[in-house]
Each structure stands twice: as structure tokens, then as C-alpha cells.
């Protein structure tokens, strides 16, 4: 996986994909900065009146349901439909799905009407979206939904059904991250517990995923693995530097973006802890 990850991240820097993010106002700044740090070019337009034009100029689309309202819903559907028409890969982050009827119905309508190259969320959100189960507390995954070494293969098998049904790649985040498509899955063991102590780490990871997919659209699963693991490595680097400085969560957030902007793809790949497996019968 290390060689594929280096190629994926190098492609991202070479292409500098214009990544159109319709995201939430809590984390838009961090998402834009982490995209710049990884080598992408962000545009954060969310006015329904212009999103079809903006997405037509873009290389990839990321839609994030964090702060939903009627305007952002209209913008999301308009941009995503146009992206599908133009063959521009779209990525969905179903933030907080399961917490409210409006949020859940919006996410399920998107699944019914839009083709997404990848879908990323915490385990609770993915479970609520895929199977109508899962416990949601704000935008944090419930402890009962945690993926562990003991159940990761069983969880991956369930996610495989979802990925196959919607012809997508699914990233379910947690202490262990799972990256699943219809044929294979990867367990990503990179990451820092400090990420759960700031708002926006998941949104940033999804933004990076969208950019990686945009720059590697023929290898979506590999792009998803590389993006997830590389962002996790940046979290580990940021945690170490924060502790060394005696810093807190604001320091960690800054160090996270610093790590993304200074670490070369080869260095990130050296630190990957990824296990890839093919599903039986494939």
C-alpha cells in the first residue's frame, strides 16, 4: 500500500485539483486550509444560484451535511446533479445522520438520486445511513458503534453490502478506520485520539478524501485508503509535536495542518499502518 499511497499523494500535488466543498460553517476554514496543505485548491461556494457553474469548473465535489438548511440542501442537490452529468467525482459526508428526520431524509434522498464515488462518516453515521441503525450523539460516534480488532471483518462485510448496492467506496471512521468497496477492504490504524477533541477533524479528512479522489478518479478505493491513512499520520505527527510543546487542542489543530503541509508523500507512506484484504469469494 505504501507505493500506491505515494503515487496517490503525488498525483494530488501534481494535479492540485480544484475541489468544490459545500460544507458547514463550523469547519469551512479548516477544510480549506487542509486542502491547501495537501496541495489541492479549495473553493467553498454554497449559493444555490451559482453552484452548478462552480462545480463545472471544478475537478471534484465534496458535500457535507453538518449545518443543513434549505439553502444548502438546494445547493447540494444542484451541484451534485451537475457533477454527475459532467462525470466529476462527488464525495458525501453524512454528518449527524440519524440525529433528526430532516438530516436523515436528506441523506437518503441524496443516495437515491446521486452517484457518489465515496461516502465517509463515523461508524454511527454510516450505520444510520446504510442500515437505519446506529447511535448518534451530535456528530460523535457512539461507543456502542466502535469498530475493534475483534469485529472489524464482520463490520466490513456489512459495509460491503452497502458499497456494492450504491457502487461506491465507504470510509467508516473510528479508532480503526475501514475503507470498503464491493471487492476489498482496508483497515487503517493511523490516527490520534486528539482528533476527537477538536471540531472538524472528520470534515477535514473528508475534504482530503474528495481531493484525492478527484486527482485519482480511476482508483477511488486506493485514493480513499491513502487519504484516510495520510490524514491519520498527520494526526499522529501533530499529537507528538503538541505534547512536546506542552500545548493543547488549539496547538494540535494548527500542528495538524502544519504536518499536512510539510510532510512529503514518501514520509507519510513510511508511517502508514494499513492492512488490505480481499473479501472471500471475489
Explain the meaning of each model-derived region.
Residues 34-87, 92:
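Active-site cofactor/substrate anionic-group-binding motifs, chiefly glycine-
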Residues 1-44:
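Glycine-rich phosphate/adenosyl-contacting loop at the front of the ribokinase-like
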Residues 25-32, 71-73, 100, 197, ...:
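Short glycine/serine/threonine-rich phosphate/pyrophosphate-binding segments
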Residues 199, 208-254:
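Conserved post-catalytic alpha-helical subdomain immediately downstream of the catalytic base
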Residues 233-282:
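Charged C-terminal helix
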Residues 103-185:
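Conserved phosphate/ATP/ADP-binding segment of small-molecule kinases
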Residues 72-121:
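Glycine/small-residue-rich loop that forms an oxyanion/phosphate-binding "nest" at active or ligand-binding sites
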Residues 188-200:
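Short pre-catalytic strand/loop immediately N-terminal to key active-site residues, enriched for Gly-Thr
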Amino acid at each position: 500500500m505504501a507505493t500506491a499511497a505515494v503515487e496517490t499523494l503525488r498525483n494530488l500535488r501534481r494535479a492540485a485539483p480544484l475541489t468544490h466543498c459545500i460544507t458547514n460553517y463550523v469547519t469551512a476554514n479548516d477544510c480549506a486550509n487542509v486542502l491547501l496543505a495537501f496541495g489541492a485548491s479549495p473553493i467553498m461556494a454554497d449559493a444555490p444560484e451559482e453552484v452548478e457553474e462552480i462545480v463545472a469548473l471544478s475537478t471534484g465535489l465534496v458535500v457535507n451535511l453538518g449545518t443543513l438548511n434549505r439553502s444548502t440542501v438546494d445547493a447540494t442537490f444542484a451541484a451534485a446533479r451537475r457533477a454527475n452529468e459532467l462525470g466529476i467525482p462527488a464525495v458525501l459526508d453524512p454528518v449527524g445522520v440519524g440525529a433528526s428526520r430532516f438530516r436523515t431524509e436528506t441523506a437518503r434522498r441524496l443516495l437515491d438520486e446521486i452517484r457518489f464515488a465515496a461516502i465517509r462518516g463515523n461508524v454511527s453515521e454510516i450505520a444510520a445511513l446504510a442500515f437505519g441503525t446506529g447511535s448518534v450523539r451530535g456528530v460523535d460516534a457512539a461507543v456502542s458503534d466502535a469498530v475493534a480488532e475483534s469485529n472489524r471483518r464482520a463490520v466490513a462485510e456489512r459495509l460491503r453490502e452497502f458499497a456494492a448496492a450504491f457502487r461506491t467506496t465507504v470510509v467508516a471512521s473510528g479508532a480503526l478506520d475501514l475503507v470498503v468497496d464491493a471487492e476489498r477492504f482496508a483497515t487503517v490504524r493511523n490516527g490520534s485520539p486528539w482528533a476527537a477533541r477538536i471540531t472538524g477533524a472528520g470534515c477535514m479528512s473528508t475534504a482530503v478524501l474528495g481531493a484525492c479522489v478527484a486527482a485519482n478518479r480511476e482508483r477511488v478505493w486506493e485514493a480513499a485508503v491513502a487519504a484516510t491513512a495520510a490524514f491519520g499520520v498527520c494526526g499522529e505527527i501533530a499529537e507528538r509535536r503538541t505534547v512536546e510543546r506542552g500545548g493543547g487542542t488549539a496547538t494540535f489543530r494548527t500542528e495538524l495542518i502544519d504536518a499536512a503541509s510539510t510532510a512529503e508523500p514518501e514520509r507519510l507512506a513510511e508511517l502508514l499502518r494499513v492492512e488490505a484484504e480481499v473479501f472471500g469469494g471475489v
